[in-house]
Amino acid sequence: GWDDDLSKLVAQYDAMINSAGCKYYIIIGDTDDPYYDAGVGETAWEATLHEAFGEHFINMRLYLIEHGLSDCGLETTFADMEGYCNGEISKQLRADWTHLNAYGYYSKGIGVYKKGVELGYWS
């Protein structure tokens, strides 16, 4: 674990990347609801990972807030909009506060694919 020490978290990611010896990687952000109202901004740990890994980081929570429903052809509800204001992913994409359902994982896959295209890993 990283014991809520963000520098330790970054060091753990760096160790895995260095151990793999691969320059082609994507750091995928968490999809948990934030403990506090994050809105559509980054949480402290998301900002830390974004700063540490730059273009290799995808903020998956924000990706799903911004694109999840449209990726799946779902309509945005009033409840979705209220949740977004608190930084929460639509319940239409979730099994619970941390796990996604089939729609959520489908959209997550699209997000990772798009990030790989952006980084030139595939076309």
Task: Report each predicted region and the residues it spans.
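Alpha-helical cap/lid subdomain in secreted, periplasmic
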Residues: 1-123
